[in-house]
Amino acid sequence: MGCFCAVPEEFYCEVLLLDESKLTLTTQQQGIKKSTKGSVVLDHVFRHINLVEIDYFGLRYCDRSHQTYWLDPAKTLAEHKELINTGPPYTLYFGIKFYAEDPCKLKEEITRYQFFLQVKQDALQGRLPCPVNIAAQMGAYAIQAELGDHDPYKHTAGYVSEYRFVPDQKEELEEAIERIHKTLMGQAPSEAELNYLRTAKSLEMYGVDLHPVYGENKSEYFLGLTPSGVVVYKNKKQVGKYFWPRITKVHFKETQFELRVLGKDCNETSFFFEARSKTACKHLWKCSVEHHTFFRMPDTESNSLSRKLSKFGSISYKHRYSGRTALQMSRDLSIQLPRPNQNVVRSRSKTYPKRVAQTQPTGSNNINRITANTENGENEGTTKIIAPSPVKSFKKAKNENSPDPQRSKSHAPWEENGPQSGLYNSSSDRTKSPKFPCARQRNLSCGSDNDSSQLMRRRKAHNSGEDSDLKQRRRSRSRCNTSSGSESENSNREHRKKRNRTRQENDMVDSGPQWEAVLRRQKEKNQADPNNRRSRHRSRSRSPDIQAKEELWKHIQKELVDPSGLSEEQLKEIPYTKVETQGDPVRIRHSHSPRSYRQYRRSQCSDGERSVLSEVNSKTDLVPPLPVTRSSDAQGSGGSTVHQRRNGSKDSLIEEKSQLSTINPAGKPTAKTIKTIQAARLKAET
């Protein structure tokens, strides 16, 4: 009967924390199943971190379409269908859900430390823009908390470059951080972290949870949820701010989000925005309800307001914030905070190569070249240090918080394939998440940026034609692995031979001489047999054949003479050349389609014959030969062109005369006439 038993609800989850460590939750160790409530998972994480002020934090995940969600403590894991569809294993991201309006008033050091890690991550990834002077001050506090007091023997030149604080970190900023760090003697890590938060909370974008939306004419806006209210950004500028006490309704329907605000004249105004998708709109609505409840209402009104706000959504969409509000947390006297004898364990931050003088050979690709210039005849030089490529920390085994877009470390799925929009980031950085950029992907390697850059250079060095060959080699490799023993070895050997042969065939060669030889042979062949040419495509040109044109122009002299001074008798005695053309009979096929008829005629005759046959009647079947001969000069009796046609006969005669010039032996110019006769014997239809 065991086969009829229910399948055990196995659950395997990885939680990525703010200090870049990982917590694994499984059914065997913690007893977590798919029927477990989200609050149980949160409790395991809070106990691991030793947090008591837990209402500021949450767990986030994303679905297959890279839409982010917060784990609902009141629902079971199985009810989070978007999460279940992504695994197993499942990945959750720990972070701040509600930013404290004044993080310096947090009661415990461990809570402030988690806020410090989150805000430092926000500044590093561009979600918290900082002026240069503020960034230098915050970086100095972070270095003081990380390394302690400045020691000239331990902290040599360029030691600040081992850490990253802002995107596109410059050398000038690192020098300013080093100068300020020397003035922070005696500050403990907890004090330095407190000063860091005190500086960060004054920034405009502190604690802003951004959501991309669209306004009128599909113009891009950002709605930011803050402790004080909702701010609206357009083109990196704040265009509106609505405080929570003034917001009377939040509503969504499909992809439309409504924000109703009470004005100073006690009139309500509704603002409508369009979200990217229905799930994104619902997520924005949920976050708005939770922020409004957490920061706005006192403890006596929080439940009633939550029920009221839950009715603002569409039918069957109700959401209630189940946690405590900020006011409830401040008035909670059940736990005496801070707890005595609390020891906060801090982790080292991710490190990068130090900016040092160049000691590597010329061909090194890992460290950029630096130059040393001697000034005023001194022996010591001024060294210009350029930031090297970042590498993975020797201690951390996870992939997070990269300021460089081409690092080989893995990122959160909503960072890599998120919406192409952002507030303070460029178009290349707009795939970053509005929150929680740390991530893990199971099948990605964790190499350094140097390895990835070298790999990209190697890939670019190959010919573009190797793409199809690479796919073919992969298919061959997969087929080879299905066998075993000597057959597999032989197939692998053949595969290597084929790969080497393919690489040799793909080498670039100079094809200029070969191409010239082909053109030369083709030209000789065409000169030997003009009728051997076959066109493989439609030719839109109807010009005569070049060879026929050259043959015709041999009998024509192009020096024109003005006949105004010649007498009437001299004009009558103008000599001319009689030229006749001939060719092989050509079979003409009648067709209903003019295009196919023209194509058939062009494929059956040369270009020279096409010009001669342009006057042939389409109703005939055969065209007799049109020979090309040179006749002796003949005398004409007129200076004008004469056309003789015999209607109803089989032959037609066309005579044309033109005045050309010749030079007699005495050196006097005389006028000549070239008489061109086109004779065509037509076979009548029987």
From Swiss-Prot:
<protein>
    <recommendedName>
        <fullName>Band 4.1-like protein 4A</fullName>
    </recommendedName>
</protein>
<feature type="compositionally biased region" description="Basic and acidic residues">
    <location>
        <begin position="547"/>
        <end position="561"/>
    </location>
</feature>
<feature type="modified residue" description="Phosphoserine">
    <location>
        <position position="389"/>
    </location>
</feature>
<dbReference type="Pfam" id="PF00373">
    <property type="entry name" value="FERM_M"/>
</dbReference>
<feature type="compositionally biased region" description="Low complexity">
    <location>
        <begin position="479"/>
        <end position="489"/>
    </location>
</feature>
<keyword id="KW-0597">Phosphoprotein</keyword>
<dbReference type="InterPro" id="IPR035963">
    <property type="entry name" value="FERM_2"/>
</dbReference>
<feature type="modified residue" description="Phosphoserine">
    <location>
        <position position="393"/>
    </location>
</feature>
<feature type="compositionally biased region" description="Polar residues">
    <location>
        <begin position="442"/>
        <end position="455"/>
    </location>
</feature>
<feature type="domain" description="FERM">
    <location>
        <begin position="11"/>
        <end position="299"/>
    </location>
</feature>
<feature type="modified residue" description="Phosphoserine">
    <location>
        <position position="304"/>
    </location>
</feature>
<dbReference type="InterPro" id="IPR019749">
    <property type="entry name" value="Band_41_domain"/>
</dbReference>
<dbReference type="InterPro" id="IPR019747">
    <property type="entry name" value="FERM_CS"/>
</dbReference>
<dbReference type="InterPro" id="IPR018979">
    <property type="entry name" value="FERM_N"/>
</dbReference>
<dbReference type="InterPro" id="IPR000299">
    <property type="entry name" value="FERM_domain"/>
</dbReference>
<dbReference type="InterPro" id="IPR014352">
    <property type="entry name" value="FERM/acyl-CoA-bd_prot_sf"/>
</dbReference>
<dbReference type="InterPro" id="IPR018980">
    <property type="entry name" value="FERM_PH-like_C"/>
</dbReference>
<feature type="modified residue" description="Phosphoserine">
    <location>
        <position position="402"/>
    </location>
</feature>
<dbReference type="GO" id="GO:0008092">
    <property type="term" value="F:cytoskeletal protein binding"/>
</dbReference>
<feature type="compositionally biased region" description="Basic and acidic residues">
    <location>
        <begin position="518"/>
        <end position="527"/>
    </location>
</feature>
<dbReference type="GO" id="GO:0005856">
    <property type="term" value="C:cytoskeleton"/>
</dbReference>
<feature type="compositionally biased region" description="Polar residues">
    <location>
        <begin position="357"/>
        <end position="382"/>
    </location>
</feature>
<dbReference type="Pfam" id="PF09379">
    <property type="entry name" value="FERM_N"/>
</dbReference>
<dbReference type="Pfam" id="PF08736">
    <property type="entry name" value="FA"/>
</dbReference>
<dbReference type="InterPro" id="IPR029071">
    <property type="entry name" value="Ubiquitin-like_domsf"/>
</dbReference>
<feature type="compositionally biased region" description="Polar residues">
    <location>
        <begin position="332"/>
        <end position="346"/>
    </location>
</feature>
<feature type="compositionally biased region" description="Polar residues">
    <location>
        <begin position="418"/>
        <end position="428"/>
    </location>
</feature>
<feature type="compositionally biased region" description="Basic residues">
    <location>
        <begin position="588"/>
        <end position="601"/>
    </location>
</feature>
<dbReference type="InterPro" id="IPR011993">
    <property type="entry name" value="PH-like_dom_sf"/>
</dbReference>
<dbReference type="InterPro" id="IPR019748">
    <property type="entry name" value="FERM_central"/>
</dbReference>
<feature type="compositionally biased region" description="Basic and acidic residues">
    <location>
        <begin position="648"/>
        <end position="658"/>
    </location>
</feature>
<feature type="region of interest" description="Disordered">
    <location>
        <begin position="332"/>
        <end position="669"/>
    </location>
</feature>
<dbReference type="InterPro" id="IPR030696">
    <property type="entry name" value="Band4.1-like4A_FERM_F1"/>
</dbReference>
<keyword id="KW-0963">Cytoplasm</keyword>
<dbReference type="GO" id="GO:0005737">
    <property type="term" value="C:cytoplasm"/>
</dbReference>
<dbReference type="InterPro" id="IPR014847">
    <property type="entry name" value="FA"/>
</dbReference>
<keyword id="KW-0206">Cytoskeleton</keyword>
<dbReference type="Pfam" id="PF09380">
    <property type="entry name" value="FERM_C"/>
</dbReference>
<dbReference type="InterPro" id="IPR000798">
    <property type="entry name" value="Ez/rad/moesin-like"/>
</dbReference>
